[in-house]
């Protein structure tokens, strides 16, 4: 009986490690395919955006979350439900701007960077930039334009990984004339 109970945890750990290693292989290949880190960063953001655009449907179906009424509620859903659901972590929400339109997600441990060390010749690589694109793409699908960027990264010697999110504007549905 105890053997069965341990397998579920072991399986999740294996899946997590496989995901981390596969992501590492993807970033390595992008570094070979593109001449500089800025191009790799753009490509990771673009790939993340495309994932986010599709992932939001799965998230909404699985989480049963309704429409968020403000950016603070959106931050809570992202940190407490989305990150937990897809990465198995719960980042803390800090550094709210006075206007309530900007905050930071602090990741004590970023599962994407397990087993990773940045080479010296890739000092401007934003290794986990895929996450910024995922957040931007998913939020755009629920009519929120946001700016998302890394401001701290444990791979670059910082004590935590910090993702800064800024609300830009609500996107209005542009329906063709005569349709509602």
Curated annotation (Swiss-Prot):
Chief location bin: Golgi
Cell location: Golgi apparatus, cis-Golgi network; Endoplasmic reticulum
The entry's keywords: Endoplasmic reticulum, ER-Golgi transport, Golgi apparatus, Lipoprotein, Palmitate, Transport
CDD domains: TRAPPC3_bet3
Lipid group attachment sites (S-palmitoyl cysteine): 68
Pfam family name, one: TRAPP
Keyword Transport among record annotations: yes
GO cellular component: cis-Golgi network membrane; cytosol; endoplasmic reticulum; TRAPP complex
UniProt-listed GO biological process terms: endoplasmic reticulum to Golgi vesicle-mediated transport; intra-Golgi vesicle-mediated transport
Subunit structure, interactors included: Homodimer. Part of the multisubunit TRAPP (transport protein particle) complex.
Family: Belongs to the TRAPP small subunits family. BET3 subfamily.
Physiological role: May play a role in vesicular transport from endoplasmic reticulum to Golgi.
Name used for this protein in its record: Trafficking protein particle complex subunit 3
High-level lineage: Eukaryota, Metazoa, Chordata, Craniata, Vertebrata
């Amino acid at each position: 009986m105890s053997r069965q109970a341990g397998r579920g945890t072991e399986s999740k750990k294996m899946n997590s490690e496989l995901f981390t290693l596969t992501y590492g292989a993807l970033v390595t290949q992008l570094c070979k395919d593109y001449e500089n880190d800025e191009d790799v960063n753009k490509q990771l953001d673009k790939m993340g955006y495309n994932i986010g655009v599709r992932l939001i449907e799965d998230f909404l179906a699985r989480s049963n979350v309704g429409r968020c009424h403000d950016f603070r509620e959106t931050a809570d859903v992202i940190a407490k439900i989305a990150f937990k659901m897809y990465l198995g972590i719960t980042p803390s929400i800090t550094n709210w701007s006075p206007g309530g339109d900007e905050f930071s997600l602090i990741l004590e441990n970023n599962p994407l960077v397990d087993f990773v060390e940045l080479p010296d010749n890739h000092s401007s690589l934003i290794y986990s930039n895929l996450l910024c694109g995922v957040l931007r793409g998913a939020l755009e699908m629920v009519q929120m334009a946001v700016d998302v960027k890394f401001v701290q990264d444990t791979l670059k010697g910082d004590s935590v990984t910090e993702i800064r999110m800024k609300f830009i504007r609500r996107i209005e549905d542009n329906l063709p004339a005569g349709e509602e």
